[in-house]
Structures are given as C-alpha cells and as structure tokens.
Regions:
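N-terminal glycine/serine-rich phosphate-binding loop of ATP-dependent small-molecule kinases
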Residues: 1-45, 56, 79, 107, ...
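Generic structural signal for well-ordered secondary structure
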Residues: 21-23, 48, 63, 90
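Short, well-ordered, mixed-charge alpha-helical segments that flank or form enzyme active sites
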Residues: 28-30, 66, 119-121
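A glycine- and small-aliphatic-rich helix-loop capping segment at beta-alpha/alpha-beta transitions
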Residues: 32-47, 128, 147, 151, ...
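Metal-dependent phosphoesterase core characteristic of DEDDh/y 3'-5' exonuclease domains
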Residues: 49-58, 125, 129
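Short alpha-helix plus adjacent loop in nuclease-associated cores
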Residues: 52-70
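Gly/Ser/Thr-rich active-site cleft segment
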Residues: 61, 71-197
Length: 197
C-alpha cells in the first residue's frame, strides 16, 4: 500500500523501478511465531503495556554475560567474525532474551535481523539474507572451509540455544543447512504484488 501510494503521488511509472531494498542497523526484531504479532522485548516483565517495542537496537549492551559465554566457546565459526561475536549482534541478544523472558513467551518467538524484519513486514515471507545469517547469526555458508551444514547446531547447543535448532532452525529463518528455501523477494510493480524468486 505504501509503495502504491508513493508511486501514485509522484507519478512514477512502475515499469521504471527494478527493486526495493531495505537496510538497517544490526538490531534484533522479534515476532510471535504463531500470530506474527510483534513481541515486546524491553523487559523486565515483558508484558505489553502498549509502550513496549519488539526491536532490541544494536547499541543495547545488556547481553554482556551472554556475549562472553558465546566467545568463551572459541567455536570455529567465530573465525569468520573476526574471532569473536560482538555484543551488538543478534545471537547475544537472543540468548539474553532466553535468560530473561518467561520461557513460555520465548518459546513462541521468531527472530530477525532488522533489515530482514522490514522485508518480512513488507512481503509476509520468511526469507532471510546471507549477510544477516552469516555475519550475525552463526550460519557458515556451505562450502566455506569444507562446511556442509550451514547452520551450526553444535554452536547453538554450546551456548544454550539448542531449542532454536529444532524445526530446522525455523525460528531463525532457515532450514537445516540452508538459509531459507527462497532467499529473495521481488515486487511486481505492474500487479502490485510481492513474489518470491
């Protein structure tokens, strides 16, 4: 609807547009897996009082202990992140939520990098980008250093997020060994429809 309105207001020929891209900071967005509604992540009680937000910004440094726990594993995938995972990445924030949220709420959450969340909001699909999953969520691309797994189940188990490996990493946006069955989305400006490619 927003795209259609922008095109109409500015008399832009839809055939001249080749794509729309989203960019965002390394922030974590959280939605309910069953209803797709935003899940409040501000804490401490996580009850939605109407003022809560479902995004933990990159500059939120609450997960100090969680980042330390992750880096203390010295897991091989950390080599691809400069030797350690930054507190500003999604995984320390997800682990912080697991350690602080009521378990029944955490168990219903699905997680996105903010740019991927914007794509999800715009399209309704569950695709994730390689940038988000590789650089911020512990996915090692198949073929890198002999990897054939992609998602690193042993890493998630070691840091206490083994429950996210169930359902083929669905809550993180993937299937076992693959980021997502369909990695990208396109918008058909002629028909005003989003399509998976």
């Amino acid at each position: 609807m927003c795209v259609q309105r922008a095109l109409s207001q500015h008399n832009i020929d839809p055939t001249t547009i080749r794509g729309i891209g989203f960019d965002a900071t390394c922030s974590l967005a959280v939605f309910s897996e069953d209803t797709d509604e935003p899940v409040p992540v501000t804490g401490p009680n996580f009850a939605n009082d109407g003022n809560d937000r479902n995004v933990i910004l990159w500059l939120d440094h609450r997960p100090v202990e969680e980042a330390k726990k992750i880096n203390d594993t010295e897991h091989n995938l950390l080599r691809y992140l400069g030797g350690k995972m930054s507190i500003e990445m999604e995984i320390p924030k997800v682990l912080w939520l697991k350690n602080n949220m009521p378990p029944e709420l955490f168990d219903r959450c699905k997680f996105y990098d903010l740019a991927d969340a914007l794509t999800h909001i715009a399209t309704g699909n569950e695709s994730r980008s390689y940038c988000s999953t590789v650089c911020k969520q512990g996915f090692v691309p198949v073929g890198v250093d002999g990897s054939v797994k992609g998602w690193q189940e042993d890493f998630y188990e070691a840091i206490g997020l083994g429950d996210l490996t169930k359902d083929n990493f669905k809550r993180m946006g993937g299937v076992d060994g693959v980021v997502s069955p369909l990695l990208t989305t396109t918008y058909d400006f002629q028909s005003s429809e989003f399509m998976l490619i």
